[in-house]
Amino acid sequence: MGLALEKVCFLGVIFLISACTVKKEGVKNLSYKHESLRAYENAKDYDPTTKKAAYKRNFFERHFKRYSDSQDSNTKDQPLDNGMRDSSSIQRATMRPYQVGGKWYYPTKVDLGEKFDGVASWYGPNFHAKKTSNGEIYNMYAHTAAHKTLPMNTVVKVINVDNNLSTIVRINDRGPFVSDRIIDLSNAAARDIDMVKKGTASVRLIVLGFGGVISTQYEQSFNASSSKILHKEFKVGESEKSVSGGKFSLQMGAFRNQIGAQTLADKLQAENPNYSVKVAFKDDLYKVLVQGFQSEEEARDFMKKYNQNAVLTRE
């Protein structure tokens, strides 16, 4: 009898220990989809229908701990354009070079209509109601996004190239810090292009405007194709043609032959699409100029890679 009782007690203890273990299902598979340093933890187990983390709670959570919805203190009922920070001082601060994981990133010049291709990911509940890189409060129900180098408040159209669905977002954060990702979308934007479940999507970005405003040249297409919610968040107006990305430039070479200068310029432009490369004729020479550096340090990093004897000038 005593031995049988000991057996029952032992099995009971084993059951309690196993019951107390949190079971996060599918983490390995989903972690691949959300490798962004910023987005991975909150996106992997997110269920957009309940707006809660969809994991099995352990024994103590089920019986003694009440689930908290405090992360939804910032909700879709609030104004979605609430808190846009567009002062010139904040804009300048967020255009400075910064370092993440030992790698330097250089916010840079961008032109209206410029296009970028790459992979998008998304981030949601665990960052909801927390501060973004420019000091705004992140609202996952709003159409915003994180980008490593685009100027803050740049407005871009995001097209899912696999299904041709599109949305519009305003850049208000930095990331994703994964080499093959070019943009981290809010949950609302990710749902627009049907990529929440998959986690990532191949996308094309088109710059529509700056300062949170869509340029008038895109007004017709915006009115024709955009949803009501996007019309509440974005307005059409006069927008700059470009946002300057720097005050330094490099003269990478000077040629008597225009063909030689153009060959170098084409090579540098192809390898560095975020900079402006041009050939200027001056003093009987064709000079190859690279523009758009945010700082002297950034320009000197470029020199180390291509030409230590390049001439550094302030624009």
UniProtKB/Swiss-Prot annotation:
Residues 68-79 have a biased composition (Basic and acidic residues). GO terms for cellular component: plasma membrane. Its EC number is 4.2.2.-. Residues 68-92 are annotated as: Disordered. A lipid is attached at C20 (N-palmitoyl cysteine). One of its GO terms (biological process) is peptidoglycan metabolic process. GO terms for molecular function: lytic endotransglycosylase activity; peptidoglycan binding. It comes from the Bacteria. Residues 1-19 form the signal peptide. InterPro entries: RlpA, RlpA-like_DPBB, RlpA-like_sf, RplA, SPOR-like_dom, SPOR-like_sf. It is found in: Cell membrane. PANTHER family: ENDOLYTIC PEPTIDOGLYCAN TRANSGLYCOSYLASE RLPA. Belongs to the RlpA family. Lytic transglycosylase with a strong preference for naked glycan strands that lack stem peptides. This is Endolytic peptidoglycan transglycosylase RlpA.
